[in-house]
């Protein structure tokens, strides 16, 4: 049975790099949110500075996810799937903007629950250094990233079972570690949770 694994974390934690490496190791389909579809492209424009209501952005993420989930379910028939961001990003990023959790959960009700979530943590100052060369997006401010980091831990520790992955959460701190060190930690933790993930 193929598995659906999600990578989450604040901006600059290294999740895109690690998600790609793990997907390659597991011979999995790599995917990401926002997607590169029409809705995902609109979201990227807004994140780069275009204006819209925060509720509109939340609804766009949810709509993009409808398309994404459809593709994930197709891909799972053939291989494991590894996603760089998923519904958890919507919950913590949009709650950091003051959108009620109930609203976010309702508009994402159809989202498929993954088998495992890998949360990459990092020191906030190191994350900001890693992001220095990138184009800034609306969420890439230290105060917002701090709220988002707290939001992830609040989500993991909540008793709400909505979107609770079958094999739970893996938390890996990437601060002051090489890409290889982090990769090895993640891979070992995944195998520990799902021993038959590598055939």
Curated annotation (Swiss-Prot):
Top-level taxon: Archaea
PANTHER family cross-referenced by the UniProt entry: THYMIDYLATE KINASE, UMP-CMP KINASE 2, MITOCHONDRIAL
HAMAP family for the chain: Thymidylate_kinase
Species name: Methanococcus maripaludis (strain C7 / ATCC BAA-1331)
Keywords from the UniProt entry: ATP-binding, Kinase, Nucleotide biosynthesis, Nucleotide-binding, Transferase
One Pfam family matching this protein: Thymidylate_kin
Gene: tmk
Residues that coordinate or bind ATP: 9-16
Protein name stated in the entry: Probable thymidylate kinase
Gene Ontology CC: cytoplasm
Enzyme class name: transferase
Gene Ontology molecular function, alphabetical: ATP binding; dTMP kinase activity
ATP-binding found in the keyword field: yes
Family stated for the protein in its record: Belongs to the thymidylate kinase family.
Catalyzed reactions: dTMP + ATP = dTDP + ADP
Keyword Manganese: no
EC number: 2.7.4.9
GO terms for biological process, alphabetical: dTDP biosynthetic process; dTTP biosynthetic process; dUDP biosynthetic process
